[in-house]
Amino acid sequence: MEVMNLIEQPIKVTEWQQTYTYDSGIHSGANTCVPSLSSKGLIEEDEACGRQYTLKKTTTYTQSVPPGQGDLEYQMSTTARAKRVREAMCPGVTGEDSSLLLTTQVEGQTTNLQRLAEPSQLLKSAIVHLINYQDDAELATRALPELTKLLNDEDPVVVTKAAMIVNQLSKKEASRRALMGSPQLVAAVVRTMQNTSDLDTARCTTSILHNLSHHREGLLAIFKSGGIPALVRMLSSPVESVLFYAITTLHNLLLYQEGAKMAVRLADGLQKMVPLLNKNNPKFLAITTDCLQLLAYGNQESKLIILANGGPQALVQIMRNYSYEKLLWTTSRVLKVLSVCPSNKPAIVEAGGMQALGKHLTSNSPRLVQNCLWTLRNLSDVATKQEGLESVLKILVNQLSVDDVNVLTCATGTLSNLTCNNSKNKTLVTQNSGVEALIHAILRAGDKDDITEPAVCALRHLTSRHPEAEMAQNSVRLNYGIPAIVKLLNQPNQWPLVKATIGLIRNLALCPANHAPLQEAAVIPRLVQLLVKAHQDAQRHVAAGTQQPYTDGVRMEEIVEGCTGALHILARDPMNRMEIFRLNTIPLFVQLLYSSVENIQRVAAGVLCELAQDKEAADAIDAEGASAPLMELLHSRNEGTATYAAAVLFRISEDKNPDYRKRVSVELTNSLFKHDPAAWEAAQSMIPMNEPYADDMDATYRPMYSSDVPMDPLEMHMDMDGDYPIDTYSDGLRPPYATADHMLA
């Protein structure tokens, strides 16, 4: 019997768009049909592969044929045997309609007899399927050597017909398993696919590998046969069905075959995949983008290749133009991975990535919303100057009302960055109840520093240097935020949170109405306690001659500067001045005048300038020997430091004898005010005490601290984003949860 007659007519493939599951078929084992990549229709493979061809050559297999019989006779006897088994076990079963019962039936109703007969009919059907399965396996096994030989034939017509036959065999489970067990045949299919220029042959061979890739044994056979470079080559095919088969097969390999990712990278698979993002079939794009995510995750070189081939722009376009949830989710996963790459981040933002991601923050898909939030969080430190983020900011403020930890972490972090040195964004968030929402988030966060610390930083930004800053300062008090904020100064809170809280308290103190609530919350003793502890730690390292290390990413000198600066602003209130003086802080402030850190010298001179308004404090300052370091600071390059020093010297000299006052006056005039008479008047009236700190008067360090970010528990290939630095003491950026995606690669 001819080889072609060993198989039945092909079974029509279920349309892929209706039955597509995200495993590309490997879990269900269901074969799929090729979608149109242009969304214009389907190519029915049955039209190409459903015709039968007669081959003039047969092969005899002596090892499995009874002595004295030819292959044809043995096949006939096997067929007859199967027929006899059917007739013996299931009499009357002869074809597709054999399951119908010969009984009278009222149209639209099932008779009692039919219902009683259902179990026996099911048993009969199962037996028939079992017989057919065995037949398929036996026939495919006997045909494999001949088909392998035909695939290697020099005649392209013969090769095409052989590929069609193997394709039909690969659609049935029994024969497909037989094909997977033949490395020679799989290698022949791969070789044929790689070398052919015939479109029908290319379609059939890619279809074969696609069907085999539904099983782990098939994936291994494809991988060992060098199928990955051949499949990557097929990504350049003009035939849409070939593209579909190639990308889904590669997707299954990337998911489940060890070593496939490296093989795809070495075959320049990324360079071929990124241009496919310009196709317009959503389900094809979903598989393509997931391939990109699998390849880019944990591999910096892959991220740069995607960038070089225009990937960020194409991905942002998908987020902007499509509504298919699975595509949006897979695309957001790629952007999430790319958002921790310093080179990709600006490209995504410049392509409109912030706005495109913001569109989906109100989606009904929690997994899509979460990916968009993480990506926005990671991109936000390079998006502080972006326009058109009004709707994103409003949504982020609304997201602060939810209880999900990941949502709160992302929303607070993004708001912290987007309000950094951006007066427009600060005003918008303040006007949309952002202060109230942030305070409530802090109250609900408990001990979760990943939420509390960026929320405090955002409040710090909102309470300074924009038209609504005073409104924000008052809003913190009116929403009962001051007691909760002051409590954050307590140890054992992490130093980054303590540092951010100190900065917020300094800004709140700029509002006179906040002085009494701050004093009632015992903020001054806590600040002094932190100041003493931090200064002692810093001095120990100075005495030992060692460089001061970071504690949780914060240097103790930053805490010294922050506490002193906050006390400087609080000292504007007479009651606060008295409390600060009674805590015996003047010796420490005088000692800080000798600091090698210019910013610490400035804030120390500033707080002494405030305290010197009271005669008792001025005398104490003079008694501590402050005149000498203050005279030195008159020559400081920092104009603010010199002005504060002059004001203190002028105040403590008021009760001195005329000769001393004259000497101080001459020194002040010669060193500081020689060319600026107005500055002398300013020092006399201590004008600087009425002005808030400007940005350039804050510290410029940008330390880091580690924070584990929850993994994305979706699918078996997850990505995790890792550490992020806190912002500066003033308005500072919070770079992304950066380079930890290698941890799960």
From Swiss-Prot:
The record, for InterPro entries, names: ARM-like, ARM-type_fold, Armadillo, Beta-catenin
State the Gene Ontology BP annotations.
Answer: bundle of His cell-Purkinje myocyte adhesion involved in cell communication; canonical Wnt signaling pathway; cell migration; cell-cell adhesion; cellular response to indole-3-methanol; desmosome assembly; detection of mechanical stimulus; endothelial cell-cell adhesion
Membrane topology annotation: Peripheral membrane protein
Domain of life of the organism encoding this protein: Eukaryota
The region called Interaction with DSC1 and DSG1 is annotated at 132-297
Per the record, the similarity remark reads:
Belongs to the beta-catenin family.
Free-text note on domains in this protein's UniProt record: The entire ARM repeats region mediates binding to CDH1/E-cadherin. The N-terminus and first three ARM repeats are sufficient for binding to DSG1. The N-terminus and first ARM repeat are sufficient for association with CTNNA1. DSC1 association requires both ends of the ARM repeat region.
Protein's UniProt name: Junction plakoglobin
Q: Which organism is it from?
A: Bos taurus (Bovine)
Query: What gene name does this entry carry?
Result: JUP
